[in-house]
Amino acid sequence: MSYPGQGGNTYGGGPPGGYGGYNQQDRYGGGGGNYGPPQGPPPGQYGGGYGGPGGGYGGSGGGYGPPQGPPPGQYGGSGGPGGYGPPQGPPPGQRGNYGPPQGPPGGQGGGGGGYGHPGMGNQAPPGQYGQPGPPGPHGNHNMPPQGNQAFGGTQGYHFQYSNCSGKKKALLIGCNYIGSKNALRGCINDVHNLQRYLVQRAGYKPDDMVILTDDQRDQRSIPTKQNILQACQWLVKGAQPNDSLVFHFSGHGGQEKDVDGDEDDGYDECIYPVDFQRAGSIIDDVLHDILVKSLPPGCRLTALFDSCHSGTALDLPYVYSTKGILKEPNLAKEAGQGLLGAVSSYARGDIGGALSSIMGTVKQATTGSGANQRAKQTKTAPCDAISISGCKDSQTSADAMEGGTATGAMSFAFIEVMTRDPNQSYLSLLNNMREVLRGKYSQKPQLSASHPTDVNLKFIM
């Protein structure tokens, strides 16, 4: 099978190459079949991959064997986390009607650079980052409060922050779409750079990571739709309060017509696995069902998306401005009741006024309050999930060159800011990432959360 696509070096803007007729209906399934060996370096695993002869996903983090054939339209055949049934098919006329992705900003895309650093195996990577710089101008930030955080009065909504003191697991995915005319250069590098950062700076172990990149020869380590979905299930399996999970995707992203009415703009955001032409994309609803709804209160999920149209790629309903306030204050008036009212009550001091006006907003409802109401009622979650994405839902994300190495602009900015000064709040991290990108890229990183969040708290993972 050939790799997908035609076009330039941005991370998406619809299916790479604008292929029509690929299978969107198999939203939860894997897309099995024979996947030809990818081009790339000699055999070997990049960091705690899918383990050795035993076949399970790496390390002590799970017991999944080799991926099975695709289930009939569901997670493993009998419904996914939370008992979700088979999704509806796409509306007529919406299959792949997207043009090729736009080229990168002038002078920024593509060029040079191999795959960067080799895999780490079971050893910690060599030191690549300098010593942390002096503390930034943001001062010390408070750690998140512990225990159940109630909001909404009699409506009884609640969530729990994670202190990230439990088990740490990571799933890192990089799709360069090797061999296609629409190939990207920086996505595999993004994975290795983030893996190195997590091990050296954040206390993660290679044995507790699954790495999916399309330069590997082990078929279980290729970022196909089936492998990505099964690895997502590995990531959340056995999650406990105060655990810390990382999901990272670098590759092509796009938008598809929304079929369940939860999107304010009428489109679901999606990511494209390397076999998207046969197996279809993975939409935000599916990622949310697996990665967010299955987590217990107090379990942290940090999702990092370096792809086009990724602003709400995990479908988290509370979206933050760079000032940490409502982007669209009139949305509170639109809601009338439900979670937006609950959020307002929470902001007024249900837990001691910790949030003040530092609140997010449910995604803007341009198709009426119905989509807004549905999103806020079904997407708010008691776990501690946040998403940092490379750009707004309407933007493309650049495949960039930094220091002579191909990289995703968002991934570079995140590692740069956190390496320079790890003492960041959610708000300072968002603003400092935007500052790193300012003047070079038009994209604006986005921050969203599964519950109303005090964005002045210390960012931990």
From Swiss-Prot:
Keywords: Apoptosis, Hydrolase, Protease, Thiol protease, Zymogen. GO terms for cellular component: cytoplasm. GO terms for molecular function: cysteine-type endopeptidase activity. InterPro entries: Caspase-like_dom_sf, Metacaspase, Pept_C14_caspase. Disulfide bonds: none annotated. Residues 1-154 are annotated as: Disordered. Residues 1-21, 45-66, 74-86, 105-119 have a biased composition (Gly residues). The active site is at H252, C308. It is an enzyme of class 3 (hydrolase). It comes from the Eukaryota. Its EC number is 3.4.22.-. One of its GO terms (biological process) is proteolysis. Residues 121-131, 138-148 have a biased composition (Low complexity). The keyword Iron-sulfur does not apply. Pfam families: Peptidase_C14. Involved in cell death (apoptosis). Belongs to the peptidase C14B family. This is Metacaspase-1. It comes from Yarrowia lipolytica (strain CLIB 122 / E 150). The lineage of its organism: Eukaryota, Fungi, Dikarya, Ascomycota, Saccharomycotina. The gene is MCA1.
